[in-house]
Amino acid sequence: MKFISTFLALFMATVAANAQKYIGGDISALTRNETFNPTFLDKNGNTVSDPLDIFKSEEMNIMRVRLFVKPSDYANNDPWACQDLEYVKELGKRIKDKGFKLMLDFHYSDTWADPAKQWTPKQWETLTDDQLYTKIYEYTKDALEQMKAAGAEPEFIQTGNEISYGMLWGKEGSSSLKKCFLGSSANWSRFTTLLKNAGKACREVCPSAKIIIHTERAAQTNVLTNFYDRMKSDNVDYDIIGLSYYPVWHNTSATRETAIKTLESRKKKKNIMIVETGY
């Protein structure tokens, strides 16, 4: 899900009672916005050269940046889906240099990944499942190594974006997309193997980073808990339950609180973060 007209998409709050509190936003579009020579104003109307200084003054402490595999390969290229590795390394270092924590959001696609679309990157479309298991490990490892070398090591890593129905479904328009549904066993082993291989790379390169498994089913508590039960039964290694919460789709805040409290009671070893929201 995305709102490209919004410069700062507020997102993060850890909600477990004893957890470190984080608040921040997704500023993936910042570098592109700056190509239009905008003027940034603080809440008092004063011009500020770097908007990160505004966020810091408001006591934000974490920023998220999305990463696409090769956005230039996507046929219907969206100019706002421009966050390739070089872009993200530069922005990530800038975030870290300002003293923020960095959340890196792997989309594992050339374009936006969300519950309606999880298209396999063009360069990966002909790979078998076994080859994809190797590719996601190698790609994740290489990207993280490059981020570290650039001074942009993330403290939080999303291995997928809103992956409620799986990831790397196949080529857009294919009649045999490899989606996952909770009422069926089809493709779940494939999906969780992909997650485990991505997580393995995260542990090797960034052992202190927290791995986030991100879904958007905050309005459906039973579906949400069943999803994370599946992560447990398939031994997926991760640290944080990441949720999207958009009132327009996910009903009231009471619905969100019900989902969170249920997860807290059933997943006592996992922290919970709202990693994406908008109003």
Tell me the role of every PLM-derived stretch.
Residues 20-21, 100, 209, 270:
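A structural micro-motif
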Residues 49-52, 189, 200, 204-211, ...:
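Glycoside hydrolase catalytic-domain groove-lining segments
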Residues 1-20:
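Bacterial Sec-dependent N-terminal signal peptides
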